[in-house]
Regions:
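Catalytic-core regions of core metabolic enzymes
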Residues: 7, 14-18, 82-86, 92, ...
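Glycine-centered short loops/turns at secondary-structure junctions
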Residues: 2-3, 93, 176
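Conserved beta-strand segments of alpha/beta enzyme cores
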Residues: 5, 24-26, 70, 95, ...
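Rossmann-fold dinucleotide-binding core
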Residues: 77-156
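Helical "substrate-binding/catalytic lid" subdomain
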Residues: 146-190
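NAD(P)+-binding Rossmann beta1-loop-alpha1 motif at the extreme N-terminus of oxidoreductases
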Residues: 1-43, 75, 105
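Rossmann-like NAD(P)(H) cofactor-binding subdomain of soluble oxidoreductases
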Residues: 31-36, 40-41, 48-113
């Protein structure tokens, strides 16, 4: 956007270039280039190990973070890692919030992600207008790590719903209930 100087880094350069074909920004080839001088750094990776590598590896972003910067992590990580990142970043006077998202790729593309935030509420308030550009629902959950705990609850609930649906459909199949009629009936009710 014209209000934000956006630098994009992806470990898979093809993904960054594809993104750049559709949106405005500057694709960079290193984490150092991505974060040097940045007021806000946003990450979203796959796992705890990915975050540890991106932040703390020899070519990671940690040494290049600007004092006073805001660091928003949208990765679904462990509570333990969120606390570790918060403590490590505080040592550099970098303000951290763990802010895992729900809504998948479609939610991101359509700007309707749900974000669960843990950390200093003042940091969320300072960055909320930016987060709102790609999300619909932003909920402050409490101290550092609380965003990750909320995401864990979200995942447990989704798993329970999927298991219940699977069990119900298996039961219907075992009783030779017409699946098309059943799905029509239950999709309109509770």
């Amino acid at each position: 956007s014209s209000l934000v100087n956006l630098r994009v880094f992806n470990r898979t350069m093809g993904k960054a270039l594809k993104w750049n074909d559709e949106f405005e920004g500057e694709v960079v080839t290193s984490l150092e280039e991505a974060v040097s001088g940045a007021d806000v750094v946003i990450t979203c990776t796959g796992r705890d190990e990915d975050m540890m590598e991106i932040v703390f590896a020899d070519d990671g972003l940690y040494p290049h973070l600007k004092e006073g910067a805001i660091f928003i992590d949208h990765t679904t990580t462990s509570f333990k890692l969120a606390k570790h990142l918060n403590e490590s970043l505080q040592e550099k006077s970098v303000k951290f919030i763990d802010a895992p998202v729900s809504g998948g790729e479609a939610g991101a593309v359509n700007g309707i992600l749900s974000v669960m935030v843990g950390g200093d509420q003042a940091v969320l308030e300072a960055s909320e207008s930016l987060i709102r550009t790609y999300s619909k629902n932003i909920t402050y959950m409490g101290q550092s790590g609380s965003g990750q705990l909320a995401k864990m609850v979200n995942q447990i609930c989704i798993a329970g719903l999927l298991q219940g649906l699977s069990e119900g459909l298996l039961f219907a199949e075992s009783e030779n209930i017409d699946m098309k009629s059943l799905l029509s009936a239950i999709s309109g009710g509770a």
